[in-house]
A protein has these predicted regions:
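Glycine-rich phosphate/nucleotide-binding loop
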Residues: 3, 64, 75, 125, ...
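N-terminal beta-loop-helix "entrance" segment that forms/cooperates
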Residues: 52-75, 231-233
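N-terminal phosphate-binding or glycine-rich loops at protein starts, especially the Walker A/P-loop
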Residues: 3-7, 12, 17-59, 407, ...
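Flexible, glycine/charged-enriched surface loops at secondary-structure junctions
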Residues: 54-57, 184-193, 216-224, 312-321, ...
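N-terminal glycine-rich phosphate/adenylate-binding segment common to multiple enzyme folds
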Residues: 66-161, 248-250
C-alpha cells in the first residue's frame, strides 16, 4: 500500500540522486506526552535513510498553552510555518477545562489545509487483523462542519454547536478525492453523509459529490448514510477504496479503519492545502505512556514517508517504507500491535527505530514493496467554481427564545398579539413542532424556536424583523438568537420543523 503521491509541485524539492537533494526546510513540533519519543525515533530513521531535512524546531501544544497562548501556538511561530510551508508534528495535549482551543483545528483552518488524507491498510499475516487485503484511503474535509468550533450557551438548559458546510469547501474536497483516485489508479470513490436527517448541509455534500462524479466516468461511485457506511467499513472494508466525507465523520471512521486494520498506532495522516502541508499520526499524545519507551512510532514515521513523497524525495520515502515493512515482517513489533505470527518480539520505541534503521536498503519478502518513484503528482490543489449568485428573498425569521413560563399554547398566546404584520407560523422545541397541534407527550426545554412568516410569501425587510424584535422585547420575552428565512431562486433555504 502506497501512502500518497507527490502533491503540489510548487512545494517540492527536486530529487535526482541522494547527493543533489536540496535540504527541505521543515518545521518540527516535538509534541507532548509520547510525542518527543516517537518524533526522535522517526527523525532518526528518516535521517539515517538519507532524507535531506533542514529542521526548524518549533514549540506547539501544552507548554505554549500554559504560557498563556489559548490557541497553543505563539504568534512568532506562524512566521516559521509560513516560511517552511511544511510541518511535521507529533501529537500534542490540549489542557482540560474551558478557554483552550484545539491546536489541530487551528492549524488546519488557519493554514488552509482543507484535505486530510488518511490511508489505512492491513499487514497480514504479520499484524493480526480480521481483514487481510484491506486498503482504504479516507479523504476528510478539514475546515468546516461542526469543527468550525462555533458554540454558545443560549439558555439555562440548552447549548448550541453550529454545523457550517460551504459549497466551495465541499467542492474542493470532493474534487480532491476524485483526483487522488484517478492519479493512483483507484477504482471507486464512496461518499458518506447523513443527508436523510441534515438535508441542507449534508444534502449539499451529497449533491456536490453526485455532480462532480459525472466528470470522472471511469471511477465507480456510491453513497452511504454514515451509520450503515461505518458499520460496513468495520465489517467489510474491502468493498471500499476511497471514501470522501465531512470533518466529524472522517475523524471517526478513520480511527475505526485504523483499528480494524491492526492498530491506530500504525496510521499516518497528511493535511494538504494550497500553501503548505502538515504530516502527523492520527493518534493522540497518550500522557500515561510518556517516558516509558513503549509508544509505537509507526504512525508518525509513515507520516514522515508521506512528507518525503510530497516534497519530492520519493527514493528516500521508499527506503524508509520498505525497511519498515521488513521490520514488521521480521516480527519486530511494539506492544500495541496485535501479533499474528509466533515468535514476534515486543520492543520499545527506541529499539523499534533501530530495527528499521538496520533494515534500510532491504525490501519486504512477502508484503508488496512500495514504489513511489513513478507516482503521479496532483497538478494543483482543486479550485472551486465561481459562485453563481442566486436571487435571495427574506420571507420570515426564526426567533429563538429563552422562556420557561408554561406550555407551548401559553407561549403562542404571548407571541400572537405582538406579531404585528407577520404571522406566527410555528413553534418548535429542540426541532420538534409543539405548536400548533403539538402533542402533550413531547418533552420541552426552555429553548423555543418561533417561526414568523410574512403573509402570502411576501418579502420581509430587515426593518420589519427589527421592529418584531422590539415588540418581543417590550413584551418581556428574552430572544437569544435569530435566523433569517430566505429563498434562493425561489427555493427555501431553511428546513421544516419535525412533524410540520
Amino acid at each position: 500500500m502506497t501512502l500518497l503521491p507527490p502533491l503540489p509541485p510548487s512545494l517540492r524539492a527536486r530529487e535526482s540522486d541522494a547527493q543533489s537533494i536540496r535540504p527541505m526546510p521543515v518545521a518540527v513540533a516535538m509534541g507532548d506526552g509520547i510525542g518527543p519519543e516517537i518524533m526522535r525515533a522517526s527523525l532518526a530513521v528518516l535521517q539515517a535513510a538519507g532524507a535531506a531535512l533542514e529542521i526548524r524546531e518549533i514549540a506547539l501544544g501544552e507548554a505554549v498553552y500554559r504560557a498563556g497562548h489559548s490557541s497553543g501556538i505563539a504568534p512568532e511561530t506562524w512566521e516559521v510555518l509560513r516560511a517552511t510551508r511544511l510541518l511535521y508534528k507529533a501529537p500534542i495535549t490540549t489542557p482540560q477545562g474551558g478557554g483552550y482551543k484545539s491546536l489541530n483545528v487551528t492549524l488546519r483552518k488557519t493554514l488552509g489545509l482543507f484535505a486530510n488524507v488518511r490511508p489505512t491498510g492491513a499487514y497480514a499475516p504479520f499484524v493480526a487483523t480480521r481483514h487481510p487485503g484491506m486498503d482504504v484511503v479516507i479523504v476528510r474535509e478539514n475546515e468546516e462542519d461542526l469543527y468550525a468550533g462555533i458554540e454558545h450557551r443560549q439558555t439555562d438548559e440548552v447549548y448550541q454547536c453550529l454545523k457550517l458546510v460551504s459549497r466551495p469547501g465541499t467542492e474542493k474536497i470532493v474534487r480532491f478525492a476524485f483526483e487522488h483516485a484517478r492519479r493512483n489508479g483507484r477504482r471507486k470513490v464512496s461518499c458518506f453523509t447523513k443527508d436523510n436527517i441534515m438535508k441542507l448541509t449534508d444534502g449539499l455534500f451529497h449533491k456536490t459529490f453526485d455532480a462532480i462524479a459525472k466528470e470522472y466516468p471511469e471511477i465507480a461511485t456510491d453513497h452511504w448514510i454514515i451509520d450503515i457506511g461505518a458499520a460496513r467499513l468495520a465489517s467489510n472494508p474491502k468493498q471500499f477504496d476511497v471514501i470522501v466525507t465531512g470533518n466529524l465523520y472522517g475523524d471517526i471512521i478513520s480511527d475505526i479503519a485504523a483499528e480494524i486494520a491492526g492498530s491506530v498506532g500504525l496510521a499516518p495522516s497528511a493535511n494538504i492545502g494550497a500553501h503548505g502541508a502538515m504530516f502527523e499520526a492520527i493518534h493522540g499524545s497518550a500522557p500515561p505512556l510518556a517516558g516509558r519507551d513503549v509508544a509505537n512510532p509507526s504512525g508518525l514515521l509513515l507520516a514522515g514517508v508521506m512528507m518525503l513523497v510530497h516534497a519530492g524525495q520519493p527514493r528516500m520515502a521508499e527506503r524508509v517504507h520498505n525497511a519498515w515493512l521488513r521490520t514488521i515482517e521480521d516480527g519486530v513489533h511494539t506492544a500495541d500491535m496485535p501479533q499474528a505470527a509466533p515468535g514476534a518480539t515486543r520492543v520499545g520505541t527506541r529499539a523499534f527505530a533501530r530495527a528499521v534503521i538496520d533494515r534500510l536498503g532491504l525490501a519486504p519478502r512477502q508484503l508488496p514493496p512500495v514504489r513511489y518513484g513513478e507516482a503521479a503528482p496532483l497538478v494543483a490543489v482543486p479550485e472551486a467554481a465561481p459562485t453563481v449568485r442566486a436571487e435571495k428573498r427574506t420571507v420570515g425569521v426564526d426567533v429563538f427564545l429563552h422562556w420557561s413560563g408554561g406550555t407551548p399554547d401559553n407561549l403562542a398566546a404571548l407571541l400572537r398579539p405582538v406579531a404585528g404584520d407577520v404571522e406566527l407560523a410555528m413553534i418548535t422545541n429542540r426541532g420538534v413542532k409543539v405548536w400548533p397541534q403539538g402533542l402533550a407527550e413531547t418533552f420541552c426545554t426552555d429553548h423555543w424556536r418561533c417561526r414568523f412568516l410574512a403573509p402570502g410569501g411576501q418579502a420581509l425587510a430587515h426593518t420589519g424583523i427589527a421592529a418584531l424584535l422590539l415588540r418581543l422585547a417590550g413584551a418581556g420575552l428574552d430572544f437569544v438568537k435569530t435566523e433569517h428565512l430566505c429563498t434562493f431562486d425561489g427555493v427555501p433555504g431553511f428546513s421544516l420543523g419535525q412533524g410540520q
